[in-house]
């Protein structure tokens, strides 16, 4: 498992166009900073009542990780690997392999391309992260029973607005966040607001990279 300091240095080197805050939170949720983390995707037809759709593995060595990958491939299941959990169906898109994706820097390089593509297609950080997770801008915002009824963006750190109490005078912090987010996440010219890029179904397009919007500035915005 990589330390926070080690990951930050690696992210700056290998995924320079993604803000370190964003890379950090995605890695935390996706792999817990374990470069050998694996998630096996169980087809619905094979699940029994109560079964989860994903089985997670956290081997301690690359050799053990490759053995697990071989077992998963023998079952013809899809899977995702490494720090940023690159999905097996995307290996061909980026001319890579599971073994290469267990290299932290190589994994970050691929995730950078996907995150940039998703962010530019989605037009803002929420839709971009949903795209990275699921292949569309909406699924990542919906609660999932496999994850204690939390959504992907909640697990990343975004919280839905608290509507339980109707304050006469609202929070100044909420107003500041809303103003900052409004100014920061306006879609760039030419961005496709209804993007459909993903680790699973991405049709990748090359373009000049620009730094992705900082996650810290967007946390807790109303969704």
Task: Enumerate the predicted regions with their spans.
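Catalytic glycan-binding domains that act on GlcNAc-containing polysaccharides
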Residues: 2-164
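N-terminal secretory targeting signals
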Residues: 1-20, 154, 158-223
């Amino acid at each position: 498992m990589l330390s926070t300091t080690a990951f930050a240095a690696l992210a700056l080197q290998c995924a320079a166009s993604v803000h370190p805050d964003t890379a950090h939170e995605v890695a935390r949720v996706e792999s817990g900073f374990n470069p050998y983390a694996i998630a096996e995707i169980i087809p619905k037809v094979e699940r029994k009542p109560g079964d989860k759709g994903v089985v997670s593995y956290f081997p301690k060595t690359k050799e053990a990780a490759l053995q697990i990958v071989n077992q998963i491939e023998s079952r013809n299941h899809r899977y995702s690997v490494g720090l940023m959990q690159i999905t097996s169906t995307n290996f061909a898109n980026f001319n890579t392999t599971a073994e290469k994706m267990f290299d932290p820097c190589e994994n970050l390089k691929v995730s950078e391309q996907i995150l940039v593509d998703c962010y530019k297609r989605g037009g803002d950080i929420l839709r971009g992260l949903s795209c990275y997770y699921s292949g569309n801008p909406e699924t990542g915002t919906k609660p999932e029973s496999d994850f204690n009824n939390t959504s992907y963006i909640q697990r990343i750190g975004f919280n839905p607005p608290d509507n339980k109490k109707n304050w006469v005078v609202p929070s100044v912090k909420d107003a500041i966040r809303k103003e900052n987010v409004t100014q920061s996440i306006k879609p760039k010219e030419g961005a496709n607001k209804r993007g459909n890029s993903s680790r699973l179904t991405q049709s990748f397009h090359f373009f000049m990279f620009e730094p992705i919007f900082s996650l810290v500035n967007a946390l807790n915005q109303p969704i």
